[in-house]
């Protein structure tokens, strides 16, 4: 191997897992990729077709041309349908089984820990289980994922540096046993806008509606703090310790720990995919791993048209990546879970994923 290129198309599932009938009945019938092809008016993905996607999907809108790569179907190992854990699995580790509890379950322990460490902690609304730390940081449930899996630490970065937000996130991580704590923030947004975007879901989870708050719009930074993740068993750290280069791009650099990695923050799909091509220009030996996040955001927004638009951008760059590959390079394309924009709700769906390999 000279270079391995890993592209994760966030949430591009290919059909519900067999166990959902018992553990997630709301996901019965989910098939993100198929329903995208069923519903969208325009979609052209010739490079996915070349790599064999229709050998898996068998959809009438796609051609049955002979594939130039290898293909397969992957089952999720983790419980639920989560980006963070999905990425850990892709990169080589299996996290410990976390508790699945809402933030209200740990809130008093978190308040005690933060106050002991000198932080100001308030409960702005007594009937809503979120807290405000140091007048600028909201700690609450993540309302974009499964019940009791993730807590968000959200802040306006024009008023507080991200390292302080991360410090608060790490203190919360020390106390709670859920799957993930995410420290995040953006520029050109106020704490008032963040507070005004707090919503309560039908299942009782209360948290910041991140897209509505504006934190994604400018200067977005996040760091995902996992429960029981061992980066020493991930391919990125293993290669780095053997003096291979490691490039992490987009959401991948948010969720994967690797001390010596070159990191490229990006949400915009064009930027993510262009960064992969640019990394290929200077990297001689190593791994480039990138995540396309806007597909997942389109799934949350139940926006079939936007999802297809982002997928076509990915397809365009896959063609360019293949043309730039050298003899010993290898390309992997996969997904981490599903997020069917036609299912009728805005959360992830527990789906199988595809694997396309070229090289």
Language model: regions and residue ranges:
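Feature captures the catalytic ectodomains and active-site-proximal regions of enzymes
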Residues: 1-359
């Amino acid at each position: 191997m000279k270079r391995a290129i890993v592209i994760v198309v966030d949430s591009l599932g290919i059909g519900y897992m067999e166990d959902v009938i018992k553990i997630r009945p709301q996901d019965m019938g989910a098939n993100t990729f198929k329903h995208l092809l069923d519903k969208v008016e325009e979609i052209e993905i010739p490079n996915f077709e070349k790599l064999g996607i229709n050998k898996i999907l068998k959809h009438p809108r796609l051609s049955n041309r002979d594939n130039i790569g290898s293909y397969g179907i992957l089952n999720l190992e983790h419980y639920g349908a989560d980006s963070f854990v999905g990425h850990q699995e892709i990169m080589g580790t299996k996290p410990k089984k976390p508790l699945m509890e809402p933030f209200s379950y740990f809130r008093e322990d978190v308040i005690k820990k933060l106050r002991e460490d000198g932080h100001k902690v308030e409960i702005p609304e007594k009937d809503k289980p979120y807290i405000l730390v140091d007048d600028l940081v909201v700690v609450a449930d993540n309302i974009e994922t499964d019940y009791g899996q993730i807590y968000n630490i959200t802040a306006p970065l024009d008023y507080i540096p991200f390292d302080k937000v991360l410090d608060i996130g790490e203190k919360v991580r020390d106390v709670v046993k859920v799957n993930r704590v995410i420290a995040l923030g953006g520029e050109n947004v106020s704490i008032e806008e963040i507070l005004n975007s707090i919503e309560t879901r039908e299942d009782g989870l209360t948290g910041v509606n991140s897209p509505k708050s504006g934190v994604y719009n400018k200067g977005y930074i996040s760091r995902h703090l996992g429960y029981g993740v061992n980066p020493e068993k991930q391919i990125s750290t293993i290669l780095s310790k053997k003096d291979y280069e490691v490039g992490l791009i987009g959401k991948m650099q948010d969720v994967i720990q690797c001390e010596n990695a070159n990191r490229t923050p990006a949400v915009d799909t064009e930027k993510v995919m262009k960064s992969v091509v640019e990394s290929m220009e200077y990297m001689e030996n190593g791994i480039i791993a990138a995540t396309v996040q806007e597909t997942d955001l389109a799934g949350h927004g139940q926006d079939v048209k936007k999802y297809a638009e982002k997928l076509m951008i990915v397809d365009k760059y896959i063609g360019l990546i293949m043309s730039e590959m050298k003899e010993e390079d290898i390309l992997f394309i996969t997904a981490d879970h599903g997020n069917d924009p036609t299912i009728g709700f805005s959360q992830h769906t527990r789906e199988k994923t595809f694997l396309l390999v070229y090289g």
